[in-house]
Amino acid sequence: VIGRVSSADKVAIAKEAGADHVIVDTKGQFGQEVLRLSGGDGVHVVYDGSGPKTFPGSLDSLRRSGTFCWYGPVLGGPGPLDIMSLPKSIKIGYAVFFDHVHTPALLHARSSQLFDWITSEKLKVRIGGIYPLAEAAQAHADMESRATTGKLLLIP
């Protein structure tokens, strides 16, 4: 697992979450380092929720027939794509939460599985901050500034 973070203070968090290697990058130019770490082949799959700046680096990181999973981009989408110019026969998907829980039964089953994983500590949830509900604007500003890691909780 190769992780990409935007600042050195997030390296330990990425390693704690299971990354074998962590690249610190703020310009979206991490593709060459991923290729080096993967022996020149690239990776099988990239999960990218950052935004348009990381899109080219994510594409460059993939091996032939790799999969690019774009999800919840915090900083906007990549803009129009010319699918004829995509390299290496890659596959691109955009994950939308509601498509995976579109029935009450699916929502119940997947939430139960999620909470089982949390309870058994198979999945660890990192709490990045706790804010009174009256400070929701500050929580949003902190998240938008990318200074936080983990989940932010609002307490009524």
Residue ranges and their predicted role:
Residues 1-54, 103:
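Adenosine-nucleotide cofactor-binding segment
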Residues 23, 79, 129-132:
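A structural signal for short, well-ordered beta-strand elements
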Residues 5, 14, 53-122, 155-156:
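Glycine-rich phosphate-binding loop and adjacent beta-alpha segment
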Residues 39, 63, 87, 147-148:
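Short conserved AdoMet
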Residues 42-47, 67-70, 125-128:
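Short catalytic-loop micro-motif centered on adjacent basic/acidic residues
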Residues 122-130, 137-156:
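C-terminal capping/lid region of NAD(P)-dependent oxidoreductase domains
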Residues 23, 91-93, 126:
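General small-molecule cofactor/ligand-binding pocket signal
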